[in-house]
Amino acid sequence: MPHQPPLASDSPDSRLAEVGVSRQSLCDGRMLHAVSDVVELPDGRMATREYVLHPGAVMIIPLLDDGRVVLERQFRYPVGRALVEFPAGKLDPDEGSLACAMRELQEETGYTATEWAYAGQTHPVISYSTEHIDIWFARGLTAGEQALDDGEFLDVFTATATDLLDWCAEGGVTDAKTLAGALWLQNVLSGRWALVWATADSPVHPQPAGPRYPVLRMDAK
């Protein structure tokens, strides 16, 4: 039986937990909202935590009938180069995780899917962002027309799972969410990790938790 992680996310160990006592807005941009919290450390001292509030996102691992996966290449300005990625995108206000996954898959790649499976959730930048990414698998794909956002440019291509895993091992794939997706893909294809597949309107799909922003202690002086 696998060992349990030493710290369950829903029941933090009081010896490690930090408690927010005040918050200051640092930046309120078009995409990013950065804040600075004063937190009480486990030993009673105070410290500052600066981080970005993020609404959450989804990533899709699209499986073609012949076993290939659908990928993208997109230029990422902060790192100055084009990266290989799985399709992904940010949640719109009040948008469900699966609805976002369906929308992003069609907008970015043109594909629609008949079946979906929720894999799990990853936190790509835990040191300075609340961002979470829900991982969805999609199959029964039908090709169609992209509907890219204004100012969005990307190439869509397909690859075998073996090629993708080789690129990950060789450093050709460095995007964190795509590396996490490749781990899921490898374990699903090997049968080690199971998925529950269903049509998009099926009630079996879970409703992944939305963004969990740090809560300030109400009795802070």
Language-model segment annotations:
Residues E18, R23-M59, D65:
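Acidic, metal-coordinating catalytic segment for phosphate/diphosphate chemistry
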Residues G29, P78, V125-Y128:
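Short glycine/serine/proline-enriched coil/turn segments at secondary-structure junctions
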Residues A47, G56-M59, L64, K90-A176, ...:
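Unchanged
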Residues H54-R81, E85-F86:
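A glycine-rich, hydrophobic loop/mini-helix early in the fold
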Residues L185-A198:
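Short helix-capping/linker segments at secondary-structure and domain boundaries
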Residues M1-D28, W197-M218:
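Extreme N-terminal tail/first-helix region
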